[in-house]
Amino acid sequence: MNTIHVDVVSAEESIFSGEARFVALPGEAGELGIYPRHTPLITRIKPGSVRIELPDGNEEFVFVAGGILEVQPDCVTVLSDTAIRGRDLDDQKAQEAKAAAEEALKNAKSEIDLARAQSELAVMAAQIAALRKFRQKR
């Protein structure tokens, strides 16, 4: 069976390291699907869900708040400031953070504050969407 080694790393820790049959994640130009022996690639990724299909057919989900993807024929590396295992996502915390980002958006006093609030809101919306996707798969 052909597999590819996958590493998902946050600023604090390694979130996932193992073999996979397939990886799907949100690239800047759209959804990316990666199989073993994929053409080398480096690109930015958007906030969203990384879906890792394991050799036994099970799936692992990881939320990433954007980052960098490096693909080699036998290895996929996802680097993200924030990466959370699907099973560790907390709906209440995500909803609270989204509400705080919406409030910050309303109260933004400068272009920088506005951009920061918009970015945080986009990340939290993506995290909530990833949480829903994870729950549907369970």
Curated annotation (Swiss-Prot):
* Pfam family of the protein (one): ATP-synt_DE
- What InterPro entries does the entry give? ATP_F1_dsu/esu_C_sf, ATP_synth_F1_dsu/esu, ATP_synth_F1_dsu/esu_N, ATP_synth_F1_esu_C, ATPsynth_dsu/esu_N
Q: Which domain of life is it from?
A: Bacteria
The cysteines joined by S-S bonds are none
Matching entries from CDD domains are given as: F1-ATPase_delta
State the UniProt keywords alphabetically: ATP synthesis, Cell inner membrane, Cell membrane, CF(1), Hydrogen ion transport, Ion transport, Membrane, Transport
Q: How does it sit in the membrane?
A: Peripheral membrane protein
GO CC term, one of those recorded: plasma membrane
Spell out the subunit comment: F-type ATPases have 2 components, CF(1) - the catalytic core - and CF(0) - the membrane proton channel. CF(1) has five subunits: alpha(3), beta(3), gamma(1), delta(1), epsilon(1). CF(0) has three main subunits: a, b and c.
Task: Give the similarity note.
Answer: Belongs to the ATPase epsilon chain family.
| Task performed by this protein | Produces ATP from ADP in the presence of a proton gradient across the membrane.
Q: What is this protein called?
A: ATP synthase epsilon chain
Q: Which organism is it from?
A: Acidovorax ebreus (strain TPSY) (Diaphorobacter sp. (strain TPSY))
Q: What is the lineage of its organism?
A: Bacteria, Pseudomonadati, Pseudomonadota, Betaproteobacteria, Burkholderiales
